[in-house]
Amino acid sequence: MIFGLKRLMEQLTSHPQVRSSKIKNLSRRIFNGKSLVLSQTTPYEIIGHYNQAKIRFYAATERKYLEPLVFVAPLAINMSIYDLYPYRSLIKYFTEQGFDVYLLDWGKLSYKHRYLNFLNFIDEAIPYCIDQIRAHSKSEQISLHGWSMAGIFVLLYTALKQPNYVKNLIVLGSPIDSYSSGGIGKLYKRVNMLLSKNHKIQQSIYHGMIPKRILHTPGILNAIGFKILDPKGWYEGHKQLLLNLDDEKLLHEHATLGNFLNHMIDYPGGVNQDMLFNIWLQNPLKKGAIRLKKQTIELKNIDCSLLIGAGKNDQMVTAASVKPLSELTNSRDVTFTLIPGGHLGLMSSQKSADEFWPMLTQWLDERSTQYKD
């Protein structure tokens, strides 16, 4: 930190012209950062709604594949991560590879949505949206992609719904054996052990007796929490900006990523109940099944082609936490891969774009139907 401040002072006391340019850029970033944001420039149309959710459609540059690629977004984030920069956009990349792309945008959830839970998404919203997508794309089947919490959503949807219309399933950075997820996994395991010593408290927590208004978390807390979970990445990003104030591209990228991280959306209380107290604390998916209310969902019901990915440097959901999914389904076509980057970088980093996006394209190409107009 001291080194970074020293370098900054050296820059700001350098040649007058250079100094003026750097001070101007620093001022733009601090006071007019919104004007520097580059995200969500790829054109799309809305082809359907489900309550506050929207189905975005991004047409292929030249359609090569019958099955569309459907991105299901995690809750709490805005959609920028899928279309971050004009020159490095996940959505734009796959439309250029010949896929019609659809994105499930959950909209701006708020306190009034505090009762929403996993089943509202995997048993209601996602099935409805997939029916709309199948009709719009004129394809019986789809390729379904989920990252982070959305990876859990698409996994449980595919296991629960029959028929599910999923030809190819992609699950990235999603905790399957939560206790194996580094330090945070050990913490959840320890908390679960402590709770098991007091049956009354355990029942209150695990059976939904805590009011959803208490469990509901506003977007600003989610934004702070995301940064706390990766303080090194947050610090390094600011340090690189301060050391390279004359780099116009870096200035735009810092503002764009900052805009994404600073504008998170609420987590409904019911979803926090299912994610924190079920997925993370009880770790049911390690055994291949989860109980949500009166429904037991078994991963062995999944038999489609399955690609599982984990970030090489992901400290939130480690590779050891993700990989067990490889052994829990009835798919005869399972691929596990490590992706450059951490929990966010596996979706958006330059290394992921250079290495993983082409690999995913090839994987889908080998498992998709050629489109005939």
Positions of PLM-derived features:
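Short, surface-exposed "cap/lid" segments of acyl-processing enzymes
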Residues: 42-110
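Short beta-strand/loop motif that positions the catalytic acidic residue
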Residues: 302, 308-310, 314
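Short beta-strand immediately N-terminal to the catalytic nucleophile in serine-hydrolase-like folds
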Residues: 144-146, 172, 309
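Catalytic histidine-centered segment of alpha/beta-hydrolase-like enzymes
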Residues: 316, 341-355
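Gly/Ala-rich beta-loop-alpha elbow adjacent to hydrolase catalytic centers
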Residues: 145-154
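Alpha/beta-hydrolase active-site loop
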Residues: 116-134
